[in-house]
Amino acid sequence: MSTLKKPDLSDPKLRAKLAKGMGHNYYGEPAWPNDLLYIFPVVILGTIACVVGLAVLDPAMLGDKANPFATPLEILPEWYLYPVFQILRVVPNKLLGIALQTLIPLGLMILPFIENVNKFSNPFRRPIAMSVFLFGTFLTIYLGIGACLPIDKSLTLGLF
């Protein structure tokens, strides 16, 4: 199946539109000059206006003065490392924690071979890939929230 839509030039209505110069809207707008000269600058200037507006309305406050001799009670990594930190913190054997983290890329490499019989690209028609994605997303969010809590409340998220 081709991704290009070819015009049916035997259609008299389409030939009449093309004769009047009205046919390009039927197949899509040209990128030059419509997108590059009109739409892109509006999006770029709008993004800059949003960033400047947020910086003016809610400036970043300065935190406490740095003291190299005072160590905080609990040192947390950057936010994108919270799930990894939680795995290493909860698993009793650190080697097992590292092995669990190597299973994630291995599972992602195996997933296309499990789902190769499915020819659909729509994610709602690929139940295995969708369920693995949703499970991984919820597990990552769960581990990330648990990393922000004390160790005794991290597995139950303080709910029980």
Swiss-Prot record:
The chain crosses the membrane at residues 36-56, 95-115, 128-148. This is Cytochrome b6-f complex subunit 4. The lineage of its organism: Bacteria, Bacillati, Cyanobacteriota, Cyanophyceae, Synechococcales. HAMAP family: Cytb6_f_subIV (MF_01344). PROSITE patterns: CYTB_CTER. It is found in: Cellular thylakoid membrane. Keywords: Electron transport, Membrane, Photosynthesis, Thylakoid, Transmembrane, Transmembrane helix, Transport. Its main location: membrane. It is a multi-pass membrane protein. InterPro entries: Cyt_b/b6_C (IPR005798), Cyt_b/b6_C_sf (IPR036150), Cyt_b6/f_cplx_suIV (IPR005870), Cytochrome_b_C_euk/bac (IPR048260).
